[in-house]
């Protein structure tokens, strides 16, 4: 999703809309297990479930989806939240089963009820995309807020996107910036890139190419190839810095090597073939 470039130059990219993949994201983190005060029976049950999930994860990573599904169902039946998350992702992406977003929602809700913030974020994505239920940006925002309040940085970024693009709420760049900064403060490099775009575009703030470069560099240092491309755009266009074609090529090459198609096209337009 790109923005029109200044001075008729090359466009730059705001990056993907979501921090998680369209496939609902991967299992992030692990929910709390049995508390220390749990009874011996409860502790043994939790340990058994964890062992099952570990075996299921091995099967999942090896591509043995049918075996993983059986194991995760057993672990979820005795209350393991990680297993519920895996099941939600499997139903949402069609691994080992036909795609069933309603079933994915059921499992994510169970995990969310147990306090799993990634499940809350994934429920928000289902509402945002209208998968298994009518599309609702408002419901998506509600779930992203729940996840963000539990510390989920992907949800923080998603809230920022909704305010930036006016999805279910009026456009509010200041609020978008606030949420992007929260996510970036927790190490989210996609949010750092998004902040750079706001400064480069002058959305809710004065145009500040130096600040834009600072945020792009933060994101690029974390491996964000969209930010690498955006740095190349600044160098090529001489935006806030002395125009330097060689530096632009350096950054386009870094981004292209990481798979950025915009950077690959930029190199071609500059006559660079390697």
Regions found by a protein language model. Name each.
Residues 52-59, 71, 84-93, 122-129, ...:
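Hydrophobic face of amphipathic alpha-helices that form TPR/SEL1-like repeat modules
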Residues 74-75, 110-111, 146-147, 182-183, ...:
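Canonical positions in the second alpha-helix
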Residues 47, 60, 77-80, 93-95, ...:
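Short helix-capping/linker turns of helical repeat alpha-solenoids
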Residues 63-70, 98-107, 134-143, 170-179, ...:
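Structural signature of tandem alpha-helical TPR/SEL1-like repeats
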Residues 39-43, 253-274:
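Terminal, low-structured helical/coil segments at or just beyond the last alpha-helical repeat
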């Amino acid at each position: 999703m790109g923005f029109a470039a200044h001075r008729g130059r090359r466009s730059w990219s705001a990056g993907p809309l979501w921090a998680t993949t369209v496939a609902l994201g991967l299992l992030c983190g692990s929910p709390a297990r049995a508390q220390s005060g749990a009874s011996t029976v409860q502790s043994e049950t939790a340990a058994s479930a964890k062992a099952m999930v570990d075996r299921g994860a091995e099967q999942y990573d090896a591509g043995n989806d049918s075996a993983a599904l059986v194991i995760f169902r057993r672990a979820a039946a005795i209350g393991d939240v990680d297993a519920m998350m895996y099941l939600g992702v499997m139903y949402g992406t069609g691994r080992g089963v036909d795609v069933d977003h309603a079933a994915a929602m059921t499992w994510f809700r169970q995990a969310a009820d147990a306090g799993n913030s990634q499940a809350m974020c994934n429920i928000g994505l289902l509402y945002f995309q209208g998968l298994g239920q009518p599309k609702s940006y408002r419901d998506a925002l509600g779930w992203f807020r729940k996840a963000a309040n539990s510390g989920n940085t992907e949800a923080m970024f998603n809230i920022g996107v909704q305010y930036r693009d006016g999805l279910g709420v009026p456009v509010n760049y200041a609020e978008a910036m606030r949420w992007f900064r929260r996510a970036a403060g927790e190490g989210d490099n996609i949010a750092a890139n998004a902040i750079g775009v706001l400064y480069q575009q002058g959305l809710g703030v004065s145009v500040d190419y130096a600040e834009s470069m600072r945020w792009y560099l933060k994101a690029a240092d974390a491996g964000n190839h969209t930010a690498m491309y955006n740095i190349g755009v600044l160098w090529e266009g001489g935006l806030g810095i002395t125009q330097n074609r060689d530096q632009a090529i350096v950054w386009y090459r870094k981004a292209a090597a990481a798979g950025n198609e915009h950077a690959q096209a930029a190199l071609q337009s500059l006559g660079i073939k390697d």
